[in-house]
Amino acid sequence: MDIQSHFDKYSVANGLLIYAQMPNATQLREYSEWKSIPNFQLNGKQEGIKLLRVGEPYTKNDGSKITPFVVYKMFDISQTNLPPKEKYSKKIDDKILLKAFIHDNPVDIKVEDVLTSGKCVEWNSEENLLYIQRGAEPSQLYQVISREVVKAEIESDNLVIDDFKSKCASYMICKKQGIDVSNYDFNDIPESFKNLSSKEIRKELGEIKELVEEFNNRVNHFMESISKHSKNKDYER
């Protein structure tokens, strides 16, 4: 999940390949891209990370059409003489980020002073409402809001699996946004997940990735609109 949240533009299959070959990778490029950087060198003889991409479709002699997968290599910055890219993320105001987390989501939200359950966020399926406690800690809200919103989007009758998949998605969402995820615990993997084939694992991860992408797209759309509005105000001045 760490790999998929960091390399979120990569497919699930390629995320698994990165994890299998270099789980500590941070910045991947093809050799030709690295070579365009002045003074670049590989650190000795390095094996590239083998990934897959869709090749050019072609027609076989029998008339059937084939779309092949082509193997290509990527190199991590740690395999080069270049310094690691400094991770810099501008601190986003909690109020703005919380608004982004609830922006245009598929559930209705209601803010209450106190929730009778004692939780900071509670999903009521009968009312189709997500209740949020006013004044709750932002770090808690990010995690629970993302988890409950994702859970509401999962179409399944298995509550145990729904809980686990929504927790995985919430972890990846918060990790991507730089929110502390140290309190997540994944020791409760459902028994049905433990015996999945590699194909079935990819399928489950693919569904989680789609949920994460949908949530992150809404967050990004809100943040872009805020940034655009801010630039317009600066221009008017």
Model-predicted segments: where are they?
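N-terminal accessory/interface modules of nucleic-acid-binding and processing proteins
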Residues: 1-237
